[in-house]
Amino acid sequence: MWNEFKKFAFKGNVVDLAVGVVIGAAFGKIVSSLVKDIITPLLGMVLGGVDFTSLHFGYGKSAVMYGNFIQTIFDFLIIAASIFMFVKVFNKLTSKKEEEKEEEIPEPTKEEELLGEIRDLLKQQNSSKDRA
């Protein structure tokens, strides 16, 4: 059972997924900080001091903090756009590498050339037999 677990846990896909999750979480924190600490204050300056996080309505001690919800949606949109751009650049780079691999078709070996000639001769013989 332990060996099966080791095979599963240390497969390339599982390790890649784990690394992706950790990097994604860190990336999410960076983008959230960018939105919270830089973009939102800049928007506040442009729009006349608007702070989304303080927007709320309520009755008595109860409050609905819809400003936090707006801020979270804004964070999500920025994170989604950032990840989209990252994936787009990554796909473009990997597709270039694949195109280079496809272009690098090795020249046929001497044996392959001889086999091609033999094939062509056999085709000629078969076509001449069909005519006769």
From Swiss-Prot:
Keyword Transport: yes
Coiled coil ranges: none
Alphabetically ordered keywords of this record: Cell membrane, Ion channel, Ion transport, Membrane, Transmembrane, Transmembrane helix, Transport
Membrane-spanning parts: 14-34, 38-58, 67-87
PROSITE patterns per UniProt: MSCL (PS01327)
Description of how the protein assembles with itself and partners: Homopentamer.
Protein name: Large-conductance mechanosensitive channel
Taxonomic source organism: Bacillus cereus (strain ATCC 14579 / DSM 31 / CCUG 7414 / JCM 2152 / NBRC 15305 / NCIMB 9373 / NCTC 2599 / NRRL B-3711)
Gene symbol of the encoding locus: mscL
